[in-house]
Amino acid sequence: MTTDTHTLNIEEILELLPHRFPFLLVDRVLDFEKGKFLRAVKNVSFNEPFFQGHFPGKPIFPGVLILEAMAQATGILAFKSVGKLEPGELYYFAAVDEARFKRPVQPGDQMILEVEFIKERRGVARFKGVAKVDGEVACEASMMCARRRES
């Protein structure tokens, strides 16, 4: 069930992504245009399980999970752009290039994920992604996801 306003709530996200707690890292899609871009949000809570060890007394959202959140946003954009996949097909995170971390993300932050579709060829799609907190870039990267059959 897709809304006409180009937003997606958590129930709609769960229909598209196979991820579940504690690894579902997109809370809401704020806006998207098929084949072009997507803006989503990840609310960073102190209750996230990894904050116990990353780092005690100075909790920082792990950089690899920022990349994973951006990858999940690219997966949602890919699903919304291509439509339903064949049974047994999934989008897999295939590559990340030029990742740069500009500022830490901490509990209480709201991370805005912005992904832009670049091109698709033979089931492999390229995207550019940016994660922002309070309008400031926290992370940026180029990413690829691939449409593949589950084995």
From Swiss-Prot:
<comment type="function">
    <text>Involved in unsaturated fatty acids biosynthesis. Catalyzes the dehydration of short chain beta-hydroxyacyl-ACPs and long chain saturated and unsaturated beta-hydroxyacyl-ACPs.</text>
</comment>
<keyword id="KW-0443">Lipid metabolism</keyword>
<dbReference type="GO" id="GO:0009245">
    <property type="term" value="P:lipid A biosynthetic process"/>
</dbReference>
<keyword id="KW-0444">Lipid biosynthesis</keyword>
<protein>
    <recommendedName>
        <fullName>3-hydroxyacyl-[acyl-carrier-protein] dehydratase FabZ</fullName>
        <ecNumber>4.2.1.59</ecNumber>
    </recommendedName>
</protein>
<keyword id="KW-0441">Lipid A biosynthesis</keyword>
<comment type="similarity">
    <text>Belongs to the thioester dehydratase family. FabZ subfamily.</text>
</comment>
<dbReference type="InterPro" id="IPR013114">
    <property type="entry name" value="FabA_FabZ"/>
</dbReference>
<dbReference type="GO" id="GO:0006633">
    <property type="term" value="P:fatty acid biosynthetic process"/>
</dbReference>
<dbReference type="InterPro" id="IPR029069">
    <property type="entry name" value="HotDog_dom_sf"/>
</dbReference>
<dbReference type="InterPro" id="IPR010084">
    <property type="entry name" value="FabZ"/>
</dbReference>
<feature type="active site">
    <location>
        <position position="54"/>
    </location>
</feature>
<dbReference type="Pfam" id="PF07977">
    <property type="entry name" value="FabA"/>
</dbReference>
<keyword id="KW-0456">Lyase</keyword>
<dbReference type="GO" id="GO:0019171">
    <property type="term" value="F:(3R)-hydroxyacyl-[acyl-carrier-protein] dehydratase activity"/>
</dbReference>
<dbReference type="GO" id="GO:0005737">
    <property type="term" value="C:cytoplasm"/>
</dbReference>
<keyword id="KW-0963">Cytoplasm</keyword>
<dbReference type="GO" id="GO:0016020">
    <property type="term" value="C:membrane"/>
</dbReference>
